Amino acid sequence: MNEHEQLVDRAARHAHTVVFLGGLDAGKSTLARATAAFALRIGRSVAYIDADVAEKTVGPPTTVGMKHIRSADDLTLDALAHADALGFVGSTRPQDDLVALIGALQRLRDRARTEGADLLIVDTGGEVSGIAGELLKYYMVDVLEPDLVAGLQRGQELEPIFGIVDRFFGIEIARASVHPDVVKIGRAHV
């Protein structure tokens, strides 16, 4: 098994909440969907939260979207686009309204759990650098209370965030490099 397959296996089999971190075009959404697919195959009840307010998988831009994954058909991009629940942020830049973003994450986390999800997969945006990226990820981890943080990084770009996660939360961190086949598409909305 390569490092990405190991990460998917660990998250799908053992985590209750996994947060995927990485810069732009790191493959977070692809790995999150692979984790959801495998978890579904082994009998887990999965909810997918898309916390990237610009490059959306679940729901429209400027929102946090949540989708229950009940079958493999729910993992197609067309099906994922239709959220089961939304939280409005109002900007494609998370730093513009951090309170709205964190509040939406908390409400959708609670709703997913109430509605029976035993695995919550959180796909985050690519803001990882500087104090703004570090604070954003700190507050996300704080409110989501994951038992696994999965990071896809180029070089050591996530190490400052991993240091914060380790120091303040003591949560398991799974590191992997960005897959060499990841295609950079950039951010068209920002």
PLM region descriptions:
Residues L119-L144:
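Conserved P-loop NTPase nucleotide-binding/switch module
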Residues M1-R13, F20, V143, D147-R187:
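Preference for solvent-exposed, low-hydrophobicity sequence contexts
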